[in-house]
Every structure is written in structure tokens, then in C-alpha cells.
Amino acid sequence: MENDEQIDETENFAIGKYAILFVIEVSPSMLDPVDEFTPSSLQMALICAYQLAAQRVITNPSDIMGVLLYGTESSTGRFANQMMLLDIDPPDAERIKSLQSFEKDFQFSKEKFKPCSCQVSLSSVLYHCSVIFTTKAENFEKRLFLITDNDHPAWDATERDIILQRAKDLRDLDIQVHPVFLDPPTHSFRINIFYSDFLYIVYGRQDVSNLVNRGQAQLQHMLNMITALQKPKRAHFHLKMDLGNDVRIGVEAFILLKRLESAKTNWVYAKGERFAVAVPQSKQVSFATKKELKKDEIRRSYSYGGSSVVFGSDELNKVRSFEPPTLRIIGFRDFSTLKPWHCLKPAVFLRPKDDEIIGSGAVFSAIHKKLLASNKIGIAWFVSRPNANPCFVAMLATPGSIHIRDDFELPLGIFLVQLPTADDIRSLPPINPNPISMPSNLIETMQRILRGMELRSYQPGKYNNPSLQWHYKVLQALALDEEIPTDFVDNTLPKYKAIQKRVGEYMGDVNNIVAEYRNDISDKNGIKEEEEDQGPIVKKARIEKSGKPIFAEDDRLKQLYIEGVLDKEIKALKVSQLKDILRDRGLRVSGKKADLLDNLTNYVKKL
């Protein structure tokens, strides 16, 4: 992105930077293994924290993270029975390795996690969390993950009221609470005893059943939920929408779908005791004088008409710049005039921004409602950023928040769809006037294959990018001084055994039908090899308008090849004559003349 693009840093300062605090209760039931194959709930929670920290140090190094245990016999700081296992700071290699030790040797580490004999006040724990966030994470988006199997933390009405008041304080401080309720050994976790009121205050809604993670298996779901927070939500650009007669409103745009790719952020020097960020420097030197060139001594040139046109930096900026960023409505058209093939790039989502121009939201809402009521689209002149190429866009209003899939929601607003210009529209090659039609049994068999391989419940949001995940694994191993992994599991590979089981029989039928059909076509075009009782099929020679015969007999072509004059003879033919020869033999007729000559020569060699 250009350095001079308009991004409101003050508004988006906290966007994309997260402060995550794990708050885990320590009790005898949390320390006991779930079964002989599943570790204890406390160990699972610490493993989850380790996996998250190892992931964030690569993908979001600016995030901060901490782990607070409560209900322990020992204490750190002034809060009784609360242990700050990991201070809320950016995760680094040493902190991550300390969490990793709980995964490898939890039995040795859990001795210091001895639970206390008294019940710990949850109100004191929540107050401790608010102190941590306000003192160390003021400019971050705050997430608190409460992991417990105690469904009755309030022992009397007074303690209940204090805990609920702490919940209001967390909400006022913009601290989002994400509880993970684990089932104790004796019964299922009972939300209605206390936590239904707690969650009503935190979330501000009556029905919270779908917002609560329950059961030990939900620890991994919690990790997936935190991982989803890593996608940046900053605006793509801010600009003014011009409505005419000096009427403008503020808008901001977002890209809802964007391919996430691995990007190099820094060079690292790896030969020292510790990795160090290397700052590369480059200089431009004159080839003639060997002296370093200054900025004002460098020019850019473009070739035009056999000569070079030289531009200075200021001149080049003037040529590239059309006008300041703007979105200018120039008219409206019926919605039916917009075709699916008009979309050149992914659509950009637009919404109002009232910070600079008061009333932008009201005007934007009026435009949105009018487009929907009239079944129209807006046509606008669009320049997204300084030095960006201008284009025409269609403004599409969405009627409301629409769940396209379980993992993707189409929001309420206006989408900008870039429209093609005359230079963008391309014509297709001419269509064969006599296309080969497939037999009906082949079409029916292919339909069965497609129905058998249909993924009815496919959700793209559930599949990670395999190359990106492998890239992160290698970076994580280097950052933590671990062995570089060699095994790679790609979950996007087709399940060949399942495919063979479902449609393997139909695939064999398709191959047989195609082979039979190919033989029939070969018979009709006269290129089938000699049958057992028949000699080679001899085709009649065509006569061009010029009267020159085309070598249409295979024997004649073979004889010319043996004599070594085939290349000379066929090069003298016209392209139309070559295509006739190839078409009669069922060979490809597309490409340049050299391609046609190669196709015919290769065919004769096989005779």
C-alpha cells in the first residue's frame, strides 16, 4: 500500500492488537485426568495456551498474552490464592518454552499447582483481571477466557452480588469474556445455578446458550475461536463520497475476502547466539563514475516510438495522479443490467463514517434504502487511493445481514463492484461450427460421478491454507530453536479411497465408453489402423480451388517421409490445406502453422 494512503490510525490503533488472558481455576477435579487417554483439564488448558502463544508469535507478534491461575495454595502478588503463571506480555521464545514444559512433563510441574483448601472468591479474581488489563493493556482489544468446572462460585447472596458487579465492570471496560465451562466428574456443568445471570450481564442478552463452550472437547474449539481473531479488521481506505452540488459524506471500505499469504517482514541474522533483525541498505551507483547517486539525479524513462522519454519524480507523480481519492455517483441503472461477468475484482464493502462529516450515516442509509426500493444500482467514478488507477464501479445494496454459509455473513451495506471498460472486454476464439457431440450414455455416467462426488456440507472456513500452515510451522520451529518438521499433513488432498468406493465403477465405465467412441470417430475419419482382415483405409484426395491436390493418402505421406522430403512438401501447403489434412485425421487444428506442421509430422512418424 502506498505511504500516502488515507488510513485513520487513531480509530484503528487497537484494531488487530489483542490482549488475551487465560484465567484457569485450579481444583482437585481440574488436576485429575479425565480418563487414561485424556490428560487433566488443567493440562489441556495450558496446552491450549501454549499452542496459541506459539501461533501468535508468528502471525501476530504485537499481541500480548498472559495466564492467571486461581485456587492455588501459593500466591504471586497481593491477591491471595492467585498465581500469575505468565505475565501479560508479548510471547517470546522463553515464555513459550515455559508453557511447553507443561505439555511434556506435567506431572513434575503440577506440584506447584497444589489447590488450596478454601474456596477462592471469583469477584477477587475478576477484579485482579480488570487491574491487569487497565494497567498493561490499555490500547488493546481485551479478551478474557475463563476456564472452570465450578458451576456454583458464589457461596452466599452477598458474594453473588459482588461477582455480578465485577461482571458489569468488565463490560464497562470493554473486556470481552469468553467462558469455557468444563464438566466436573460427578455431573454436567449447570449454567442455571449462577452463570446464566453472569453471562446475561456480560453479553447483554437473555439467550446465551449458543455463546458458551461446554465440555472438555471445547478447549480445541476455543483455540479455533481465538485463531479467528487474528485476521486484521482495519479499513482498506477512507474517502469522501461525492453526491453532487458540493454534497459529500464520509465512507470507509473493507475487503471481506482476501487471500492470506506468507509475507516476509524482516531479514534475520541467524549466525549469532540469538536471532537478530537485519536492516538491509541499498545504494544506487553510477556505472560510469562509480559514485553514489542522489535522488534528484535519478530519472525514469519509457520507450516510445524508438526513443526514450525521460521523467523526473515530480513529473511522474503528476502523470500517475488523476485526482484525489473519491467516489462520485454519476447515475443509476436497473439491477438487471448488472451481469455476473461484469465483476473484475472482489467486491469492496462500504459503510458510512461519521467522524469527519456529521450526518454521513443518515445520508448513506437513505441511499441504501432508495437503491433497494427502486431495484437499482448506482454507477460511480472511483479512485480508491492516491496514485491508484480510476475505474467505474457498480453500487449494490444488500437487503440485510445474510448468512451465506455458517462461517460467513454478508453484512448490511453497499458493495462496490468494479466494472469492465472497453479495453477489458475480450472476444473468444471462434467456436467450432460442428462440435463433437458426446453419446447420451457417457453424459449420464458423468452425471452419476458428479453427484457421487458432490460435497454438500463443504465450508471453506473450516479448511486452513496448507502452504501457509506449513510456513508457520517452520517459522515456529526456528523461533523456538526446535527441530524443523519433516512430515506435512495436507487435509485438502482428495480422499481417493472414498472416491473409488463411491464412483470408481462409473469411472471405469466412462473410460470404456470414451475408448469405444474414439474408435468410432477414428473409423469415420479414416485414421484407424489396419484391421485384422482389412487393409488400410484409403481416402479420396481433396482438390483445392487452385487445383493443387492435398496429400490425403497415408501411404503417400509415409512415402514422402521415407524419402526425406515430407517437411519440404508440407511446408509449401497453405494453412487451410494443412487444417483439412489434420481435420480428416481427427488431429488438432489449433495453433500457428508451425504447430500444424508438427502435428502432421508426428502423426506420419507413427504410421
UniProtKB/Swiss-Prot annotation:
Alphabetized Pfam families for the sequence: Ku, Ku_C, Ku_N, SAP
BP GO terms, sorted: DNA recombination; double-strand break repair via nonhomologous end joining; replication fork processing; stalled replication fork localization to nuclear periphery; telomere maintenance
Entry superkingdom: Eukaryota
EC class: hydrolase
EC number from the UniProt entry: 3.6.4.12
UniProt domain SAP: residue ranges: 570-604
Locations listed in the record: Nucleus; Chromosome, Telomere
Catalytically driven reaction(s): ATP + H2O = ADP + phosphate + H(+)
InterPro entries the record matches: Ku70, Ku70/Ku80_beta-barrel_dom, Ku70_bridge/pillars_dom_sf, KU70_core_dom, Ku_C, Ku_N, SAP_dom, SAP_dom_sf
Record domain Ku: where: 241-452
Keywords from the named record: ATP-binding, Chromosome, DNA damage, DNA recombination, DNA repair, DNA-binding, Helicase, Hydrolase, Nucleotide-binding, Nucleus, Telomere
GO molecular function terms listed in the Swiss-Prot or TrEMBL record: 3'-5' DNA helicase activity; ATP binding; ATP hydrolysis activity; damaged DNA binding; telomeric DNA binding
One GO cellular component term noted in the UniProt record for this chain: pericentric heterochromatin
PANTHER family: KU AUTOANTIGEN DNA HELICASE, X-RAY REPAIR CROSS-COMPLEMENTING PROTEIN 6
Job description of the protein: Single-stranded DNA-dependent ATP-dependent helicase. Involved in non-homologous end joining (NHEJ) DNA double strand break repair. DNA-binding is sequence-independent but has a high affinity to nicks in double-stranded DNA and to the ends of duplex DNA. Binds to naturally occurring chromosomal ends, and therefore provides chromosomal end protection. Required also for telomere recombination to repair telomeric ends in the absence of telomerase. ku70, of the ku70/ku80 heterodimer, binds to the stem loop of tlc1, the RNA component of telomerase. Required for mating-type switching.
Family: Belongs to the ku70 family.
Subunit structure: Heterodimer of pku70 and pku80.
Protein name (Swiss-Prot/TrEMBL): ATP-dependent DNA helicase II subunit 1
Organism, scientific name: Schizosaccharomyces pombe (strain 972 / ATCC 24843)
Lineage, highest ranks first: Eukaryota, Fungi, Dikarya, Ascomycota, Taphrinomycotina
Gene: pku70
